[in-house]
Amino acid sequence: MKHVLTLLALASVFAVSNQALAYDGQNCKEPGNCWENKPGYPEKIAGSKYDPKHDPVELNKQEESIKAMDARNAKRIANAKSSGNFVFDVK
């Protein structure tokens, strides 16, 4: 009787664990595309309360800083080629 109860308990644990492994909590539209919006989240973001409404000036700050960084790096490389040693702070 003890063996039967043990086997029954193991079988039930195995059955429950297989069901738990099979369900991942997502409804995928296709493999790799499993994002689901939360209830109440709009299909279209523009014009909703979730729209970030970025300022174009703020968006261009990163582009300007990257251009300035590239210009500084070009000066450093030109100085390194002409002098033979690398100097970080080149005016």
Curated annotation (Swiss-Prot):
<dbReference type="GO" id="GO:0004022">
    <property type="term" value="F:alcohol dehydrogenase (NAD+) activity"/>
</dbReference>
<comment type="subunit">
    <text>Heterotetramer composed of 2 alpha and 2 beta subunits.</text>
</comment>
<feature type="disulfide bond">
    <location>
        <begin position="28"/>
        <end position="34"/>
    </location>
</feature>
<protein>
    <recommendedName>
        <fullName>Methanol dehydrogenase [cytochrome c] subunit 2</fullName>
        <ecNumber>1.1.2.7</ecNumber>
    </recommendedName>
</protein>
<dbReference type="InterPro" id="IPR003420">
    <property type="entry name" value="Meth_DH_bsu"/>
</dbReference>
<dbReference type="InterPro" id="IPR036557">
    <property type="entry name" value="Meth_DH_bsu_sf"/>
</dbReference>
<keyword id="KW-0485">Methanol utilization</keyword>
<comment type="function">
    <text>Catalyzes the oxidation of primary alcohols including methanol.</text>
</comment>
<dbReference type="GO" id="GO:0005886">
    <property type="term" value="C:plasma membrane"/>
</dbReference>
<keyword id="KW-0560">Oxidoreductase</keyword>
<dbReference type="Pfam" id="PF02315">
    <property type="entry name" value="MDH"/>
</dbReference>
<keyword id="KW-0997">Cell inner membrane</keyword>
<keyword id="KW-1015">Disulfide bond</keyword>
<dbReference type="GO" id="GO:0052933">
    <property type="term" value="F:alcohol dehydrogenase (cytochrome c(L)) activity"/>
</dbReference>
<feature type="signal peptide">
    <location>
        <begin position="1"/>
        <end position="22"/>
    </location>
</feature>
<keyword id="KW-0472">Membrane</keyword>
<keyword id="KW-0732">Signal</keyword>
<comment type="similarity">
    <text>Belongs to the methanol dehydrogenase subunit 2 family.</text>
</comment>
<dbReference type="GO" id="GO:0015946">
    <property type="term" value="P:methanol oxidation"/>
</dbReference>
<keyword id="KW-1003">Cell membrane</keyword>
